[in-house]
Amino acid sequence: MKKYKALHFGAGNIGRGLISDIYMKNNMDFALVDIDKDLIEKLNKQKSYSIIDFQTNKVFQISNFKAFSIDQEDEIKKWIEQADFISTSIGWSNLASLKKFFENVKLKEKAQIICFENGYKISSFFQSILNIDSNHFVNASVDKIIPNFKSDSLDVYVESYYEIILEQKNESQKKLNFVNYSTDLEAYINKKLFLVNAIHSTIGYLGYLKKYTYINEALNDQQILFKIKRLAKIINEILSKEYLLFKVDYLNDYLEKNLKRFSIKENQDLISRVARNPIQKLSKNERYFLIYNLVKKHNLEIDILLEIYKSIFYYDNKMDKESSKIQSTIENKSLAYALKKFSNLDQEDQEKILKSLAKK
């Protein structure tokens, strides 16, 4: 049987630590593309690396792959034309930079394009950028914690748990093993986006305010945990109202499972990693705005959500470009101006945040 081929943009943690693993377990020929030339050179020179489960110490070897620098346009285009699966994990705000690779290129008839990105239906968003037949695009929900361990090694340390759910479009669709498929992907995207991504980053922002370094440290703080539980209660109410397949008890269990994942000491998940790119996290196809919209729709308590928004605007990390942009806007203009520019909140809710600060 002829092997499927896959091309993946993004040789970072998710690309090396999850997507390559899936492609290799599916016995596929695959290639990685990245903007980091040193990383690509290392991958080509070493020709293999290990994925190490930090919970069980199991090791899985990744090998027999190709690796291309982003400036190897001709090679990348050849792979795009030959690929059965084309995927990304570069951050959805960077997807427009890939448009040139799809110009004057003929995809295979049943080629699938999958964006393994945090956000709402990002593959559909990518389709709007490329303006290619939507039948090629498969939306995805992907969940795995892969911390940034400081090391010169290509090896990746990962948690045991992972979940990938892909959109089931039709019966003739080529399927990957070791992933799940659903015809109701929106429900699963939002469940993961709200109860994994939003909860995770919120722990980060609240933890930063109390000067913690790691997520597990912040989660041991009872004041932070209390706020997380308040936010989660609202989220669970939203999800159970929006999607009949989710009962509140199931969502509570799902939350507790995720809190246990986040609290694993060996994880060593840096708050600076989890809280990065706050402007992106506040955008309209991301976690906080989607929760905000549904809170307004169902007329639920909004105070805890606005408190979380406030903590995001207090996040001041000089090493993070988006955080620095927010802070310089506050410094050079005002918090009111920054809220208007970045929060996407209604005017009345921006004013509630400002009034809550004025009372202090």
UniProtKB/Swiss-Prot annotation:
EC number: 1.1.1.17
Ligand binding (NAD(+)): A6, L7, H8, F9, G10, A11, G12, N13, I14, G15, R16, G17
One Gene Ontology term, aspect cellular component: cytosol
PANTHER family (alphabetical): ALTRONATE OXIDOREDUCTASE-RELATED, MANNITOL-1-PHOSPHATE 5-DEHYDROGENASE
GO biological process, one term: mannitol catabolic process
Keywords: NAD, Oxidoreductase
Molecular-function GO term, any one: mannitol-1-phosphate 5-dehydrogenase activity
Reactions the enzyme catalyzes: D-mannitol 1-phosphate + NAD(+) = beta-D-fructose 6-phosphate + NADH + H(+)
Family: Belongs to the mannitol dehydrogenase family.
Top-level enzyme category: oxidoreductase
Pfam families in UniProt: Mannitol_dh, Mannitol_dh_C
Highest taxon, organism lineage: Bacteria
InterPro entries, sorted: 6-PGluconate_DH-like_C_sf, 6PGD_dom2, Mannitol_1_phos_5_DH, Mannitol_DH, Mannitol_DH_C, Mannitol_DH_N, NAD(P)-bd_dom_sf
Protein name per the record: Mannitol-1-phosphate 5-dehydrogenase
Gene encoding the protein: mtlD
